[in-house]
């Protein structure tokens, strides 16, 4: 969350600006925009990938649009090449939200390397964890320097206890960093282990009655296998299944709720009904 906020501030996002976000994501994505007093514009999702729907973006772009935040949901990469083409044509920043997708790739190119900035989460349930905290990447040294200044109270690196701007206390502790670095040393092994589990689930669930969709599988993408996802037929009660799994010691959870259905975020969509995100939330 702080990484998203920091990148937005470093890019100069402010009151009066608009930032396009997908309707299905953890609330941190839209909250970071609101922290900047900017206006989030909620976008429909793709029915297959559950990521931001590229075909819906153009109609949401206005003269006030300054950034798009694609979220690689549950480790599934967005259609980044198409999105980058739109953003470059309109001179709009792209901030990749890779909170759930460290290790995911498109044609062997890692997510987080397409946009102007990208953010990663090291929360306790993530593939790499430091308990809390995250990471931000930048492809512009000037923006990187600004973010580095802002994360440490805006304190000048040339004059001790001199503050050129109002900054934040967004520093990761050395202990947290050490925990994260130790995991990065066996990163490939961690991903491989998770993908083995995914393959096991795929074999067990493939063709089973009541399961409409397994995690998307495409030759040109690598899913980092963060969370295994299922779409259930409407005759299966999702919440009852979650409770039955819990009784068996198996943790499961519903998908994220549609942002535009929740009180703090109503009014940030240009459409009355976002059919794909509404359907996913209910399944």
Regions found by a protein language model. Give the residues of each.
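PLP-dependent aminotransferase class I/II
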Residues: 55, 67-71, 76, 80-82, ...
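Conserved active-site segment immediately N-terminal to the catalytic lysine
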Residues: 96-130, 159-164
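PLP-dependent aminotransferase-like
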Residues: 9-98, 105
């Amino acid at each position: 969350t702080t990484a998203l906020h920091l990148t937005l501030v470093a890019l100069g996002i402010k009151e009066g600006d608009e930032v396009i976000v997908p309707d299905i994501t953890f609330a941190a994505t839209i909250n970071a925009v609101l922290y900047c007093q900017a206006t989030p514009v909620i976008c429909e999702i793709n029915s297959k990938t559950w990521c931001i729907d590229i075909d819906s973006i153009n109609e949401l772009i206005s003269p006030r649009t300054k950034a798009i935040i694609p979220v690689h949901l549950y480790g599934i990469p967005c259609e980044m090449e198409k999105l980058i083409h739109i953003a470059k044509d309109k001179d709009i920043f792209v901030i990749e939200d890779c909170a759930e997708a460290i290790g995911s790739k498109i044609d062997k190119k890692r997510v987080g390397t397409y946009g102007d900035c990208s953010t990663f989460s090291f929360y306790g349930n993530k593939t790499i964890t430091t308990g809390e905290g995250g990471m931000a990447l930048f492809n512009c040294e000037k923006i990187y320097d600004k973010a580095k200044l802002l994360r440490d109270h805006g304190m000048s690196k040339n004059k001790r206890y001199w503050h050129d701007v109002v900054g934040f206390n967004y520093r990761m502790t050395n202990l947290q960093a050490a925990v994260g670095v130790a995991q990065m040393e066996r990163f490939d092994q961690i991903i491989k282990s998770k993908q083995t589990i995914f393959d096991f689930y795929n074999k067990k669930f493939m063709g089973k009655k009541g399961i409409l969709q397994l995690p998307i599988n495409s030759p040109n993408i690598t899913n980092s296998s963060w969370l295994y996802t299922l779409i259930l037929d409407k005759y299966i009660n999702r919440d009852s299944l979650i409770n039955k799994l819990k009784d068996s010691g198996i943790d499961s959870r519903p998908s994220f709720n549609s942002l535009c259905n929740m009180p703090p975020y109503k009014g940030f969509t240009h459409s009355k009904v976002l059919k794909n995100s509404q359907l996913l939330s209910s399944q």
